């Protein structure tokens, strides 16, 4: 499958011209690594099982050794080796060069790093693909053009039917779901992501066992209330109507989903 350009490509390029390193965060499967590899000239993947043990040993004992390689150098899922953060920060300070490193991560769980990276490591958030990025929207309406030329808007028509839009909403903007498969297979990507997030990731993020059914109920309630004026109390009431869950436990689950970058309020 050919690479589909992302709106964030230009954002990353500009940040690489201004900072020594850039951290890209976003939920699993939204395309962070693929996008980063378009601009990286070498990379380390900490979840590559063939190399993982060796990489982590070096990262824990002499992390600067992993910085050797063509630049920009990508560190995928860097949070598995948090000492790499300090090594990158120091190298950026010492060299004074911009565009040296890209880091990607699928969680915002607190990392024990001695330095925040401010003014050395810039951050950017990535999301699943928009309909324009997936080439389903014709892009005739541009918010930028409307602001720059408010009188230039003319009537236009979407190439998508109502059924197309409903399907796209259920499928989501996950790049893996855009490969040449049947519609049921495309929907299966979103279903599997939802299931694994609620049954595995929500507990693994901070090693706290959580109830998969409660997690699913909370996310379903969030989905129902997106783009509404519903507050946290309304969603909590919706959840507790079917789950015997306390307010404190509810917010614990919300915190877990925020760490996984699934919820972004």
Protein language model features and the residues they cover:
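Conserved lysine of the Walker
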Residues: 32-33
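P-loop (Walker A) phosphate-binding loop of NTP-binding proteins
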Residues: 27
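Hydrophobic anchor at the beta1->P-loop junction of P-loop NTPases
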Residues: 24
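Short regulatory helix/loop adjacent to the ATP-binding pocket of P-loop NTPases
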Residues: 109-124, 135-140
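Sensor-1/coupling segment of RecA-like P-loop NTPase cores
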Residues: 94-114, 257
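Interdomain hinge/linker elements that couple catalytic modules in large macromolecular machines
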Residues: 136-265
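N-terminal pre-Walker A segment at the start of P-loop NTPase domains
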Residues: 1-13
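Conserved nucleotide-sensing/catalytic segment adjacent to the nucleotide-binding pocket
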Residues: 56-102
């Amino acid at each position: 499958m050919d690479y589909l350009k992302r709106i964030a490509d230009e954002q990353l390029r500009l940040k690489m011209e201004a900072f020594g390193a850039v951290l890209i965060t976003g939920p699993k499967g939204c395309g962070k690594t693929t996008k980063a590899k378009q601009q990286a000239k070498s990379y380390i993947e900490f979840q590559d099982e063939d190399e993982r043990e060796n990489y982590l040993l070096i990262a824990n004992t002499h992390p600067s050794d992993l910085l050797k390689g063509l630049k920009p150098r990508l560190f995928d899922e860097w949070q598995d080796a948090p000492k790499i953060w300090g090594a990158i920060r120091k190298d950026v300070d010492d060299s004074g060069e911009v565009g040296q490193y890209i880091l990607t991560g699928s969680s915002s769980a607190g990392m024990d790093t001695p330095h925040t990276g401010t003014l050395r490591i810039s951050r950017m958030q990535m999301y699943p693909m928009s309909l324009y990025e997936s080439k389903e929207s014709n892009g005739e309406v541009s918010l930028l053009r409307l602001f720059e030329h408010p009188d230039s808007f003319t009537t236009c028509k979407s190439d998508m039917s109502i059924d197309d839009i409903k399907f796209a909403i259920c499928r989501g903007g996950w790049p893996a779901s855009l490969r040449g498969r049947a519609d049921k297979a495309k929907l299966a990507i979103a279903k599997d992501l939802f299931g694994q997030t609620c049954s595995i990731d929500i507990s693994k993020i901070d090693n706290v066992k959580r109830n998969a059914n409660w997690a699913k109920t909370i996310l379903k309630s969030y989905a129902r209330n997106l783009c509404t004026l519903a507050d946290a109390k309304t969603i909590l009431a919706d959840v507790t109507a079917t789950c015997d869950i306390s307010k404190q436990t509810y917010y614990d689950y919300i915190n877990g989903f925020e760490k996984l970058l699934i919820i972004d309020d």
